């Protein structure tokens, strides 16, 4: 299976990078990957390209907290389906449940869920792949997105007191005045934050009233989840190729590079 993420998220991140003074096209050109920010937002991009782009942009900006900076400019609520799900939730607990389902539907190979404990509910994210150099910015980006969903009910000043980050650490966090005395642990495949149960009945509100993302006339969650990335190599490659077609048919070498395979090995796989 080829892990994919929605191009719409890449577009939001690319816009945030431009606002932070980083040239999106310069980063993509340096990395030798397609300009996904110019593709159909309804299409899909490899998760690996998304990760490499954030890391490359962080190096261009010379920032150790670039993952947080991107998420602050392009808040999780700018994804219209997430914003509308939060808006229709009766309380923070319902918003967290919906957000987990929608964020999982936004990519494959990644699982989101709520882990119920006696004093807190943990928002958890599991990735099948082990971390590599440069993934710190992606983990920052993921952590900030989780926190922003909770802030819709707890207020913008809220920060988790217990955090689990994927990797072996250390991963840079905002200054102490923002993160407080949070207890941070590391796990090989999971990132998570603890939300106190006292916050769960809180009503939710938007923290991004000036979002430039247009509000959809209707929100159809089942349809959205049915269009999640394909779970087989051939189907995933079809989705990628369709996304890239407006810019010309990609070569087998380009597709193989995206899939992380040798062109001949990919051809043999497709012939089977």
Locate the predicted segments by residue.
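Short acidic/histidine-centered micro-motifs embedded in hydrophobic/aromatic stretches
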Residues: 30-34, 166, 258
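Surface-exposed, interaction-prone regions with an acidic/low-complexity signature
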Residues: 1-12, 19, 115, 120, ...
């Amino acid at each position: 299976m080829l892990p994919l993420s929605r191009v719409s998220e890449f577009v939001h991140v690319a816009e945030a990078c431009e606002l932070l003074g980083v040239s999106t096209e310069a980063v993509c050109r340096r990395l030798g990957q397609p300009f996904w920010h110019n593709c159909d937002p309804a299409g899909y991009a490899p998760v690996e390209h998304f990760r490499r782009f954030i890391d490359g942009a962080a190096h261009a900006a010379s920032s150790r907290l670039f993952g947080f900076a991107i998420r602050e400019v392009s808040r999780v609520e700018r994804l219209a389906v997430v914003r509308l799900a939060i808006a229709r939730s009766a309380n923070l607990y319902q918003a967290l449940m919906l957000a987990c389902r929608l964020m999982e539907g936004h990519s494959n190979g990644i699982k989101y869920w709520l882990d119920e404990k006696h004093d807190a509910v943990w928002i958890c994210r599991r990735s099948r792949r082990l971390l590599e150099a440069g993934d710190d910015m992606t983990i920052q980006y993921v952590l900030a997105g989780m926190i922003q969903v909770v802030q819709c009910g707890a207020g913008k000043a809220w920060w988790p007191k217990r955090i689990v980050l994927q990797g072996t650490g250390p991963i840079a966090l905002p200054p102490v005045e923002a993160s407080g005395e949070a207890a941070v642990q590391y796990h090989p495949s999971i990132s998570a934050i603890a939300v106190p149960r006292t916050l769960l009945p809180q009503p939710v509100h938007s923290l991004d009233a000036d979002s430039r993302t247009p509000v959809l006339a209707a929100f159809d969650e089942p349809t959205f989840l049915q269009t999640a990335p394909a779970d087989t190599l051939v189907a995933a490659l079809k989705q990628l190729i369709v996304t890239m077609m407006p810019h010309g048919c990609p070569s087998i070498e380009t597709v193989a590079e995206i899939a992380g395979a040798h062109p001949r090995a990919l051809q043999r796989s497709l012939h089977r």
